[in-house]
Amino acid sequence: MPAYIIVEIDITDPVGYEEYKRLAGPAVANYGGKYIVRGGACETLEGDWHPQRIVVLQFENMERAKEWLNCPEYAEPRKMRHRTAKTRMILVEGLSS
């Protein structure tokens, strides 16, 4: 079943975060992931939630998503993300076809 990583991002260093985005994309692709949402307009419809930025990644399954998160190619970009933004991240399983 497909799996989705959903990330809420509060950017604290915009210049550094742009570099992170440049480095993160190839690692996502190497693990079969693709960006479903990468920033863009975000509007709160219910509740008290006002994210600055949302990213949604799709992977083949939950295991593959975790492999990407912990892969050597993403180690340095991941550290960069931690330095340039405050993030909250969840992994959810999608529906089968």
Where are these regions (language model features)?
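C-terminal structural segments of small proteins and small subunits
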Residues: 62-90
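Short S/T/G/P-rich N-terminal loop/turn motif that feeds into the first structured element of a domain
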Residues: 1-54, 58-70, 93-97
